């Protein structure tokens, strides 16, 4: 079955219809029904509950969550993909038990209204808001961000309603079942990767602001500076030699850490900045990408205590989904396409939307 284009999906969202969006097979490998929150009716919620069977959630921007006074459900997110659930909600007026399709639609309408305020909703309730990462799918390739992107691109408030599609036996529907579901119900279907690629053509959240040579004790690198227009963070790319799209590039994506990087504190199982730069210098070409993040005094103090504690077992590689988008945009700008990644194997979502592919993982030596 041929997938629909992003323009086709946007048009259906604009008409108040649902679409199906799939993510990567190496992530959740699921498909969600998605529609703009402003367009939700009772029959839409009923369709989701009856036919899709997943959890009905309401993605919205950080700004809307703050305006509605919605704190995160937990302060320390332990979920595998960093999905930011807030406390559940109910419309303050116009509902009875809150669980009926009509009541849930009313709750969505109350929270999605352009002039909605905290007094319009109460907690707990039967709708589960999700806080989207600023920058949308260019920052985090999840259904939460995709729903906000599609609603915004269709001319609505950047807020949606999503529901995972499940099979009759309760298992998650994968691509073959999702395509059959879409055909049966006349719903257009696409991928998050295609949405990312579409947005990259029309908009970006990271821009190159400076470039200069850098003579270090580990080699002669080229230093390129980028700024994230959403978060305001500054990221640095150290390149050596020629980057060729047709050939795999040696790449290290490194979250800047003032203690470990400057004091050269060893962390078992992870590439240090020095080791990564040395590896690239020995290879004669490659990219070391340094992702910068603002760190407060309390965070720094907690980090010092963590380093001072007893050595922990070698950590497993994990993905910080909020930084994958910025890093992917930068690598794409540098001309990287295929990567030999200095990292233990980890899962990414929809990096194919950035025209990137990991062909080999190189764990820390």
UniProtKB/Swiss-Prot annotation:
The record marks 126, 164 as: Essential for catalytic activity. Residues 202-365 are annotated as: GTP cyclohydrolase II-like. It catalyses: D-ribulose 5-phosphate = (2S)-2-hydroxy-3-oxobutyl phosphate + formate + H(+). Mg(2+) 1 binds at residue 28. Pathway: Cofactor biosynthesis; riboflavin biosynthesis; 2-hydroxy-3-oxobutyl phosphate from D-ribulose 5-phosphate: step 1/1. Pfam families: DHBP_synthase, GTP_cyclohydro2. GO terms for cellular component: cytosol. Keywords: Lyase, Magnesium, Manganese, Metal-binding, Riboflavin biosynthesis. D-ribulose 5-phosphate binds at residues 27-28, 32, 140-144, 164. GO terms for biological process: riboflavin biosynthetic process. Residues 1-201 are annotated as: DHBP synthase. GO terms for molecular function: 3,4-dihydroxy-2-butanone-4-phosphate synthase activity; GTP cyclohydrolase II activity; magnesium ion binding; manganese ion binding. Mg(2+) 2 binds at residues 28, 143. Binds 2 divalent metal cations per subunit. Magnesium or manganese. The keyword rRNA-binding does not apply. Its EC number is 4.1.99.12. Its cofactor is Mg(2+); Mn(2+). In the N-terminal section; belongs to the DHBP synthase family. Catalyzes the conversion of D-ribulose 5-phosphate to formate and 3,4-dihydroxy-2-butanone 4-phosphate. This is 3,4-dihydroxy-2-butanone 4-phosphate synthase. It comes from Pseudomonas aeruginosa (strain ATCC 15692 / DSM 22644 / CIP 104116 / JCM 14847 / LMG 12228 / 1C / PRS 101 / PAO1).
